[in-house]
A protein has these predicted regions:
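Acidic, histidine-bearing metal-coordination/catalytic regions of metal-dependent phosphoesterases
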Residues: 1-46
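Short amphipathic alpha-helices and their capping/turn segments at secondary-structure boundaries
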Residues: 33-37, 62-71, 183-184
Length: 261
């Protein structure tokens, strides 16, 4: 008589098989409308590198850098959690990644909750700055293309202050998507963030769990719009406290900026 695997064991094997297939990076091109976009930025590409979580990244540094480089980005946004507070502060890998990415395109970064939890936010920022990345902590930097400029803000405060520059779109890099209603109230036009890890396990557009949102989160990955605010949420490139990603491949969004869609 042939024994059939028990249902629980079959489910476990199925989840493990899915988990193994989820290690390849999904590169997702996302057209984004910015109505006041300067002409030099029409069609500009922005790679979003979020939630790498060294030393628990799902890709090696060369593999990740290659994925970004072939997208030919005009800029790279890093919305936090390049490190993992549950293991250790991996300064060596952080510096290597920062140096390699800054050689591709101008890079703009904020801290995530893992950097803040470690109490290493200043150290994190110093490593990034030393290796060519603009570190934004409730501050801004200018991204220039062909003589025209967009001011980029990095937001770390829980309740953001409305920010605007006359004649320019308000573009903000921050970490947490669960503050979307604050971002809308601040009238930010484009917000780029991570943190939710795609909800860990996905079934179509539905996901299981995200930090700060709990089970069945609203903002786990993709594009969200309300009023005049567009928020793009990366599903991230690494693992943290929950080691499995099921039907949830590592995610490299590439924003394609347009004046309208």
């Amino acid at each position: 008589m042939i024994r059939q695997p028990r249902p629980a064991k079959r489910l476990l094997h199925h989840l493990m098989a899915l988990d193994r297939t989820d290690q390849t990076v999904q590169i997702e091109e996302i057209p984004v409308a910015c109505p006041r976009l300067p002409a030099a930025f029409h069609g500009a590409r922005v790679a979003v590198v979020a939630d790498v979580h060294f030393p628990d990244a799902l890709l090696s540094i060369p593999a990740l850098v290659d994925c970004v480089a072939i997208q030919n980005p005009g800029a790279i946004f890093l919305p936090g959690d390049l490190t993992n507070s549950y293991t250790f502060f991996d300064e060596v890998r952080l510096a290597k990644l920062a140096k390699a990415l800054s050689a591709i395109a101008p890079c703009y970064a904020v801290a995530g909750n893992h950097e803040m939890r470690l109490g290493r936010e200043k150290r994190y920022g110093a490593i990034l700055e030393r290796n060519g990345i603009h570190y934004l902590s409730d501050s801004y930097a200018d991204w220039t293309m062909k003589g025209e400029t967009i001011r980029l803000f990095g937001a770390a405060r829980k309740r953001p202050t409305p920010l605007a520059v006359d004649g320019q779109p308000s573009v903000v890099i921050t970490h947490k998507p669960d503050r979307f209603h604050y971002y809308c109230r601040a009238r930010w036009e484009l917000v780029v963030c991570g943190h939710a890890h795609g909800g860990q396990m996905r079934l179509g557009e539905h996901s299981l769990y995200a930090p700060g949102q709990g089970f069945f989160p609203t903002y786990s990955g993709g594009v969200y719009t309300a009023d005049n605010t567009v928020m793009v949420v990366s599903r991230g490139l690494g693992n943290s406290s929950i080691p499995w990603r099921v039907s949830n491949r590592p995610h490299l969004p590439v924003l394609i900026l347009q004046p309208k869609l």
